[in-house]
């Protein structure tokens, strides 16, 4: 048997961290011996645990320690981080460390350095005395890359000290929840976050246009509750189609009936915007008179439209190189405190992979599996609201305005 001592510190009981640690050891056929366990006596007091973890051999023990490391386990002996040079551009040394989306620190030069721009499934490099989390495609030959878990500390999220909608939801997904109560709680979170100067990003799919939630999202942008819009070609095209023709995918938004020749409207829309020189120019020329993109431009709210192989056109502002789009999205998400994902599974998962675990994340979709897939792919902090986005957004805006009136 091989053994290694590890320790945990934080809200180990109410955040279920210690329970998860024991489950990991047992699920991987390991053994443990608890040496010390100090329980915090008050709500804000951290707990501390120290134990010996046993594995059959070095490889088995290393497997267990890797999983424990992801939830905050650390080696009591302070060790310097291990580094190895990248042998070529986009090529990593053996045993390179793969990040989680939790706040991470590395021990370098006798100091704990915070890892900047943390997100999941990336690597850590040391450059000019600072630690950076970067994707594989940004690694260059000679970069000093972190290998192994020595000298790396992960701080997993803990249960909030006060009751919030995120504690109320508990990260679970169910359609059997009081939807209006949840939306009211989310509205309160949004209102209080903006009072503190926080920033909110919205990830939206074209269903926002098709379900007539467009006006509510445009109003949220106009009233200053949205600081960043992340979407694709379709949302912008159909939003502008509504502004020009009053249809979305050829359906009359007011009457709910197809319009003769309406199936061509989105193509006419794209052509008009391209001819005008882009969305901003089309607004300046009076072609686009209202809607989501109109409010973004008029209120200087940045937007990033990422392209896909399904796109018609696309619009001039759409970034067709997905790697460039991902990089721009990552840069734009710096400083964002909350992300609201609206009826777009693939875009939601893509953005979720770029977020640190401390960013509040709300995913709204009719399909419960969308939220489940988002969390299964690592965005465990997300809460799910299983409802029609066409009902959610107007009610959310109404609740925010009610809170404004009371304050």
From Swiss-Prot:
Cofactor: NAD(+)
Keywords: Lyase, NAD, Nucleotide-binding
Catalytic reaction annotation: L-ornithine = L-proline + NH4(+)
Tagged with keyword Lyase: yes
Signal peptide: none
Role noted for this protein: Catalyzes the conversion of ornithine to proline, with the release of ammonia.
Name this polypeptide is given: Ornithine cyclodeaminase
Record organism: Archaeoglobus fulgidus (strain ATCC 49558 / DSM 4304 / JCM 9628 / NBRC 100126 / VC-16)
